[in-house]
Design a protein with these regions (language model features):
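Non-catalytic ligand/cofactor/substrate-binding and regulatory segments of enzyme domains
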Residues: 1-101, 114, 130, 134-156
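Intrinsically disordered, low-complexity regions enriched in glycine and serine
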Residues: 155-171
Length: 171
């Protein structure tokens, strides 16, 4: 990684506050260490999806589980702002879906645009892994019907960034 450009950092939070680690094996029949919410820290702000695209100097609504430096970007902030405006309608309260359009999917779109990399599969694929369990199959259709109401952060309109939560399978 060169020293030029902005660092692209994935910030990972645990929406379960540790409960997934202690209860998932018994409940799901598989070990899930966290229920991840992600945001991307770049240009001095954290960009996340919660009811819409949001950004803040530092999110801080819950303790951070880990930070993953995914690379550097040479994309100017102005071009990134155009990207955000271009995807804003894809990431709204109405389009939120626990399994297919959550904070982790938004973060993935952002890091692909900025650095040409992806969010780690252990985060991005967690909903599919949970849906493969008997309990996941029982609950996911009900959760999917609830749509945007399932955004665990209960975010409202847009700010300008990425990442938003999703109980059971990530943000």
């Amino acid at each position: 990684m060169s020293d030029e450009g902005e660092r692209v950092v994935l910030r990972v939070y645990d929406l379960s506050n540790g409960m997934a680690r202690t209860m998932s094996q018994q409940f799901l029949g598989m070990q899930v260490d966290i229920v991840p919410h992600t945001g991307v820290f770049v240009y001095g702000r954290e960009w996340f999806f919660s009811g819409g695209i949001q950004s803040a100097p530092s999110w801080g609504m819950m303790p951070m589980h880990e930070e993953i430096v995914l690379g550097q970007t040479g994309v100017p902030l102005e071009i990134f702002a155009e990207f955000i405006e271009g995807v804003r309608e894809q990431y709204t309260a109405a389009t939120y879906n626990l399994a297919t359009n959550n904070c982790n999917h938004f973060s993935n779109a952002v890091v692909e645009f900025l650095a040409g990399v992806q969010v780690p599969e252990r985060i991005l694929n967690l909903p599919e892994q949970i849906m493969a369990t008997p309990m996941g199959q029982a609950f996911m259709p009900m959760l999917a019907q609830m749509g945007g109401a399932m955004d665990p952060l209960g975010g409202g309109g847009g700010g300008g960034g990425g990442g938003g939560g999703g109980g059971g399978g990530g943000g």
